[in-house]
């Protein structure tokens, strides 16, 4: 219960998350004195954060003469702190293709972390805040889509309509928000034409389909098709339907089983001898990065790099 409480107040709150990471860094020399679950949690917590290269704004205007769409983007809680480059790549790519990106200040967390931890009251506060904020934005300026670049978040957002189906005040709004929600790869595949030039050198890319993506949202072929357009060799991982062991907070709450799943996943990945790994979920990225030295990038980063000057992928700092 103590671990669940710690996770519920830490992960969705960026300031508390950063403070906790500092405390974790200071406590690492003494982790041998701690229970195994606490040790595992300490191992997974970051101790440094990448610098953000994009200014924080509520509206990122299209960089083309004509705007073709207006979307809202969930920048997330944990992801925007440990891997801000994912949101930056998302916004760059969308702006470059005529899409205006709206990031309302009132949106913090999608609510999925507390939802899966059984903290329903806290989760529903986030759900209601997000539904009302995005609906107001939609009414004000018509949103063509609400995008998530973290598949675990997107799965929950697509469920808002079902969760509030019997709520007289929110059922209509929640249904609209869920119908507008798309994974970033889903939206790009359906709505944008990427101008990807042949960069010459081709990489062997192992694509990991996150459980929340392939099972939760039934989105699989779209990111694979987009990656194939980068002229790299895209390889699907053997037993790709099996979890990497992240599963939200599962890798902390059930660390023994999670480690077994991670070992199996990494063995399957490394059997392909890829240059790097690609996936669409920050939880999977963090988990897999702790089990292999093979660099791992978000799908949107691969696409963004393919549209500009692609350099050698480097290992993610998580």
Question: Can you name each region flagged by the protein language model?
Answer:
Residues 1-311, 315:
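Iron-sulfur cluster-binding electron-transfer modules in prokaryotic oxidoreductases
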């Amino acid at each position: 219960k103590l671990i669940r409480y710690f996770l519920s107040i830490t992960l969705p709150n960026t300031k508390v998350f950063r403070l906790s990471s500092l405390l974790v860094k200071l406590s690492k020399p003494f982790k041998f004195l701690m229970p195994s679950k606490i040790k595992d949690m300490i191992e997974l917590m970051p101790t440094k954060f990448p610098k953000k290269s994009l200014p924080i704004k509520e509206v990122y205007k299209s960089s083309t003469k004509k705007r073709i769409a207006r979307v809202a983007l969930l920048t997330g809680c944990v992801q925007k702190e440990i891997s801000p480059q994912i949101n930056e790549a998302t916004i760059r790519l969308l702006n470059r293709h005529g899409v205006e990106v709206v990031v309302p200040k009132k949106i913090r967390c999608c609510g999925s972390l507390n939802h899966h931890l059984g903290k329903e009251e806290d989760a529903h506060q986030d759900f209601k805040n997000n539904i009302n904020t995005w609906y107001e934005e939609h009414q004000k300026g018509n949103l063509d889509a609400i995008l998530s670049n973290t598949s675990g978040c997107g799965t929950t957002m697509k469920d808002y309509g079902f969760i509030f189906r019997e709520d007289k005040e929110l059922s209509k709004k929640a249904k609209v928000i869920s119908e507008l929600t798309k994974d970033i790869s889903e939206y790009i595949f359906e709505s944008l034409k990427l101008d990807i030039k042949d960069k010459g050198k081709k990489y062997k890319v192992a694509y990991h389909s996150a459980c929340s993506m392939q099972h939760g949202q039934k989105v699989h072929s779209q990111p694979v098709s987009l990656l194939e357009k980068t002229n790299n060799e895209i390889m699907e991982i053997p037993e790709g339907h099996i979890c990497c062991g992240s599963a939200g907070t599962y890798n902390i709450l059930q660390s023994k089983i999670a480690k077994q799943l991670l070992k199996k996943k990494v063995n399957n990945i490394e059997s392909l001898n890829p240059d790097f790994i690609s996936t669409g979920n920050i939880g999977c990225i963090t988990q897999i990065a702790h089990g292999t030295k093979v660099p791992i990038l978000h799908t949107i980063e691969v696409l963004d790099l393919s549209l500009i000057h692609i350099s050698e992928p480097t290992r993610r700092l998580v």
